[in-house]
């Protein structure tokens, strides 16, 4: 589980001096302007320029002089159990207001151990509401032995004034709390880190607008030969475009310029690429009067219904992600076989005649690819189909599907999109999901 999902609702800013009152070590909040390239975060004591912001339980972090990797003192993290009213997980970020020049280092390293086998999320670059150069490793395995963790920095030349030094996040194991210890947190230059690459990524393009890439998956080869997987900001890289007249990229924003065709973005500082497979038109703008519509997903109407848009039902392989192309929102379904779109609250369709949905097939096809669209009343064992239609899809073109609803339709609980036997495509785009009456 990715515990940072809870940061926005559990973030608690702590006055550092009072927070550590009575602890063995204190963080000095005076900014150390004379050492902008300081490598230490925690080496028996906190670096003098650091401040701390707790996530989850505010009192989860302290220091310990008994259990340590080396020296005299370690950081002690008390991970609470899920029922702790003060906070049901432990996390925090160490930062400096002045920023540090980290361009001479290529890794953040630390040692960690735990009272129980668990996993930890950790990284750097978490500062403020809009981190610029974040790097995260999830699923770090922790046990009763001290183990060194290496968090590679994909392109440290960008970090000339970085403020986010180190963050961690951990949750309960088997509904129980436990203790973590972290020690020797510092930035290093490790000469045997090599072969930085981004995971190849494909996406749809649109005639105009900006598309923001929030994160990339990357890999860096560690001294032990393992390719360490990291989640990182695209801003670490400078990308070149194979067709700049069609699309360009600046930091983490792709801008489309109106042309059509394939575009490949390659980073100068790493291997791998981001490929825009084609430029697609936007879905047709709906023309129904809003008074006759109950909308789930459309930029034309007020969406009074809501859904996570993927029920992750048994045996499905379908993933989903939303594309925001200059304010136009489109849902992408990949590795598609079928997907359930379960409504957060049932839709009263007693006065509605049709379910509408626009679908675009991204795969090349022989012209014989179909999709089944269904509306269901009830769920689980009590599900009943109240509307169904099989439609032939067209590569690169939007197909509008209008599914007649049964005359006795009352509350619609879920929708289902399914690839019938004989069809073999993988990727579709979906827009304008709503119910309407004539």
Put a short name on every predicted segment.
Residues 16-53, 189, 193-198, 279-287:
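Bacterial Sec-dependent N-terminal signal peptides
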Residues 86-90, 117-127, 164, 365-376:
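Beta-strand acidic-aromatic groove motif in beta-rich domains, primarily in extracellular
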Residues 129-161, 378-412:
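Extracellular carbohydrate recognition and processing domains
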Residues 110, 148-188, 357, 370-373, ...:
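Extracellular beta-strand ligand-recognition surfaces/modules
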Residues 63-87, 316-340:
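Short carbohydrate-recognition loop motifs
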Residues 229-253:
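Low-complexity "stalk/linker" and mucin-like segments enriched in Ser/Thr/Pro/Ala/Gly
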């Amino acid at each position: 589980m990715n515990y940072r999902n809870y940061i926005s609702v559990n973030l608690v800013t702590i006055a550092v001096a009072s927070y550590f009152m009575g602890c063995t070590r204190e963080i000095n909040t005076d900014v150390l302007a004379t050492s902008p390239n300081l490598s230490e975060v925690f080496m028996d004591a906190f670096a003098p320029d650091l401040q701390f912001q707790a996530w989850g339980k505010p009192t989860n972090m302290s220091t310990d002089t008994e259990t340590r990797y080396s020296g005299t003192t370690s950081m002690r993290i008390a991970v609470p159990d899920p029922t702790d009213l003060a906070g049901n997980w432990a996390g925090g970020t160490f930062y400096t207001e002045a920023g540090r020049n980290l361009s001479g280092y290529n890794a953040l390293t630390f040692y960690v151990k735990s009272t129980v086998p668990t996993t930890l999320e950790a990284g750097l670059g978490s500062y403020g509401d809009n981190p610029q150069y974040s790097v995260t490793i999830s699923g770090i395995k922790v046990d009763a032995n001290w183990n060194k963790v290496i968090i590679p920095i994909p392109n440290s030349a960008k970090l000339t004034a970085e403020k986010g030094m180190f963050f961690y996040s951990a949750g309960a194991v088997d509904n129980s709390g436990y203790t973590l210890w972290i020690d020797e947190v510092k930035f290093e230059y490790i000469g045997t880190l090599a072969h930085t690459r981004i995971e190849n990524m494909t996406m749809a393009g649109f005639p105009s607008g900006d598309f923001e890439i929030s994160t990339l998956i990357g890999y860096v080869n560690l001294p032990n030969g393992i390719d360490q997987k990291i989640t990182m900001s695209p801003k670490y890289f400078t990308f070149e475009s194979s067709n700049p007249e069609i699309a360009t990229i600046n930091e983490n924003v792709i801008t489309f310029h109106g042309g059509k065709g394939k575009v490949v973005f390659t980073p100068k500082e790493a291997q791998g690429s981001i490929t825009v497979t084609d430029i697609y038109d936007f879905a047709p703008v709906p023309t129904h009067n809003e008074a006759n519509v109950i909308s789930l997903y459309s930029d034309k109407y007020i969406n009074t219904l809501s859904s996570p848009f993927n029920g992750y039902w048994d045996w499905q392989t379908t993933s989903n992600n939303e594309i925001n192309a200059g304010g136009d929102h489109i849902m992408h379904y990949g590795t598609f076989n079928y997907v359930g779109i379960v409504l957060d609250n049932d839709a009263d369709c007693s006065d509605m005649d049709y379910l509408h949905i626009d679908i675009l097939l991204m795969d090349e096809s022989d012209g014989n690819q179909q999709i089944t669209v269904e509306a269901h009343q009830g769920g689980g064992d009590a599900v009943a189909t109240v509307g169904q239609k099989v439609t032939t899809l067209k590569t690169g073109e939007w197909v509008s599907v209008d599914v007649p609803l049964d005359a006795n339709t009352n509350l619609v609980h879920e929708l289902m999109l399914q690839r019938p036997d004989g069809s073999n495509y993988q990727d579709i785009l979906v827009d304008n999901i709503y119910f309407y009456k004539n």
